[in-house]
């Protein structure tokens, strides 16, 4: 979870910031344009448009509003997952790990340009070189294909460098304490979930930080409790849309959440459907606000020190951009605050 930046100026050049925007066919006879949604031109810090987030990572962008005592509203980034409560196994994985991403994404069914982007995201140099070696034997490689490959590679690497916290003047924030495993969070030590999080590339770490909000957020001595339980976990398979204990949360998937990119494909769905005359009940309750039944992603524990000016655009480079979990960039929780509630703080 992160603060939504102010955005770009009206006169600023419109730039597609989605990492999948450069997808093209390596076959000169095929014309293809990546179907990005309009938010791809928003400087929101996701570096992926909502269309591709839904299609590839089974998540959809949202905002989490936070109000202060004067009713001022600050919107934080968060995502809701699009995994039904009846789904099991590999279908519940939102962001897979480096060991299983090719199977989870079914990479062999994608265009080579999209495969190349995923391999770059997961730092799989061997797979990247394999694609290049295979394309060298295609017709028109030197006259056309090589130029297209370099364009896709350069555009993707530019975004990956932007989301790498170790890059000079990186635009991603790393100056807050954030835990994705609350087991040792009260002692300001990371757990297994945090170690697994650190194995991800900078792009995927930024994506998780944007998509997953904390159960608890502590700003100095002020503690905000958003949820009393996690709605996702990070394990060896990746970021998974599963609760730590008990049955999965009810999460109905609307028809608008389904990407219908394959109209000729037969898909069988077992859905819950109500029948009968409900108009009278609808009229009685129509004046009340509806409670959303979808499941936003909450996990862990986050601590922010007000000296870091949390409420500013977090794309502005910090004094210590390389501060990571357990580092000395921020102060620990005040006595009697971090140990009172039963959860943690994270983003």
Swiss-Prot record:
Origin superkingdom: Viruses
Primary location group: virion
Coiled-coil blocks: none
Any one cellular-component term (Gene Ontology): host cell nuclear matrix
GO MF annotation terms: structural molecule activity
Subcellular location: Virion
Keyword entries, A-Z: Capsid protein, Late protein, Virion
Signal sequence range: none
InterPro entries: Baculo_VP39
Stated family: Belongs to the baculoviridae major capsid protein family.
Function of the protein: Most abundant structural protein of the nucleocapsid produced during the infection cycle. The monomers are arranged in stacked rings around the nucleoprotein core.
Note: Expressed late in infection.
Protein name in UniProt: Major capsid protein
Organism phylogeny: Viruses, Viruses incertae sedis, Naldaviricetes, Lefavirales, Baculoviridae
Gene: P39
């Amino acid at each position: 979870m992160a603060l939504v930046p102010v955005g770009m100026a009206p006169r600023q050049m419109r730039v597609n910031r989605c990492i999948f925007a450069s997808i093209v066919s390596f076959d000169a006879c095929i014309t293809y344009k990546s179907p990005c949604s309009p938010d791809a031109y928003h400087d929101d810090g996701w570096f992926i448009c909502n269309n591709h987030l839904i299609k590839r990572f089974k998540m959809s962008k949202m905002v989490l509003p936070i109000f202060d005592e004067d009713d001022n509203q600050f919107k934080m980034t968060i995502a809701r997952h699009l995994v039904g409560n009846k789904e099991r196994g590999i279908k519940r994985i939102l962001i897979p790990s480096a060991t299983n991403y090719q199977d989870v994404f079914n990479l062999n069914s994608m265009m080579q340009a999209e495969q190349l982007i995923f391999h770059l995201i997961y730092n799989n140099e061997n797979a990247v070189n394999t694609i290049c070696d295979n394309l060298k034997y295609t017709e028109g490689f030197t006259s056309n294909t090589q130029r297209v490959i370099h364009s896709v590679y350069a555009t993707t690497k530019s975004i990956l460098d932007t989301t790498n916290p170790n890059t000079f003047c990186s635009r991603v924030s790393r100056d807050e304490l954030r835990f994705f495993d609350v087991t040792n969070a009260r002692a300001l030590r990371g757990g297994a979930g945090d170690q697994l999080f650190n194995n991800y590339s900078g792009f995927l770490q930024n994506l998780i930080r944007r998509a997953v909000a904390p159960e608890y957020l502590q700003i100095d001595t002020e503690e905000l409790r958003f949820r009393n339980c996690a709605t996702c976990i990070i394990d060896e398979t990746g970021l998974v849309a599963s609760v730590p204990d008990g049955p999965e949360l009810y999460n109905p998937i609307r028809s608008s959440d389904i990407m219908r990119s394959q109209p000729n494909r037969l898909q069988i769905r077992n859905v819950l459907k109500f029948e009968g005359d409900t108009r009278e009940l609808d009229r009685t309750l129509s004046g009340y606000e509806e409670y959303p039944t979808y499941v936003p992603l909450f996990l862990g524990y986050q601590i922010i020190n007000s000296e870091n000016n949390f409420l500013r655009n977090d794309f502005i480079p910090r004094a210590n951009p390389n501060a990571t979990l357990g580092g000395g960039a921020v102060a620990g929780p005040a006595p009697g605050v971090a140990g009172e509630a039963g959860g943690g703080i994270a983003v």
